[in-house]
Regions:
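A short, structured active-site edge motif that brings together acidic residues
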Residues: 63-73
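Asp-based phosphoryl-transfer active-site loop
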Residues: 3-18
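Substrate-recognition element of Asp-dependent hydrolases with the DxDx(T/V) motif
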Residues: 28-50, 69, 106-113
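HAD-like small-molecule phosphatases
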Residues: 71-148
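Substrate-recognition/cap helix-loop segment adjacent to the acidic, metal-dependent catalytic center
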Residues: 45-65
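Catalytic-core regions built around general acid/base machinery
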Residues: 22-35, 94, 98
Length: 148
């Protein structure tokens, strides 16, 4: 008997229209009724997962969510952070510098500012749209070294 099922959202649980099929909803309901813990997992921020958590009624103190590609794990019912692995401002600045050298776009999720980028770009726009987030344009060099 399984005790826990972790489901990736994009490309797995969600179809190409970003919808949970009725078949998947029924299977999740059946698993939960059998006492299996169902965990949604995603590279998305929590805000970008909330509507699916609500749709599946994943909201009790026995429910967990894994987001930001696993860097955050949270008990949904109690809001307790179970795991947190984030980069600081010093690392973010180093990554942004390297991205500039390579001519790559960069954006990050800041606990203080939300979705941040130095220059708005199509990739950041897509990230913002998918997750329902506002974008803050800012110079990464202005982040304090201990900024999360």
């Amino acid at each position: 008997m399984y005790k826990l099922i972790a489901l990736d959202m994009d490309g797995t649980l969600l179809n190409s229209d970003k919808v949970i099929s009725e078949e998947n909803k029924q299977a999740i309901t059946k698993a939960r009724e059998a006492g299996v813990t169902v965990v949604l997992a995603s590279g998305r921020p929590l805000e970008g997962m909330q509507d699916k958590l609500d749709e599946l009624n994943i909201n009790s103190d026995k429910d967990f969510v894994l987001y930001y590609n696993g860097s955050m794990v949270k008990n949904i019912g109690t809001n307790e952070i179970i795991h947190q692995q984030i980069i600081d401002g010093k690392a973010a600045k180093k990554i942004a510098r390297k991205a500039k050298e390579l001519g790559a776009y960069v954006h990050a999720f800041s606990q203080e500012h939300g979705l941040i980028t130095e220059e708005n770009n199509p990739y950041t726009d897509i990230e913002a749209k998918i997750n329902g987030l506002d974008v803050t344009e800012m110079n990464f060099e202005s982040l304090s070294d201990d900024h999360a």
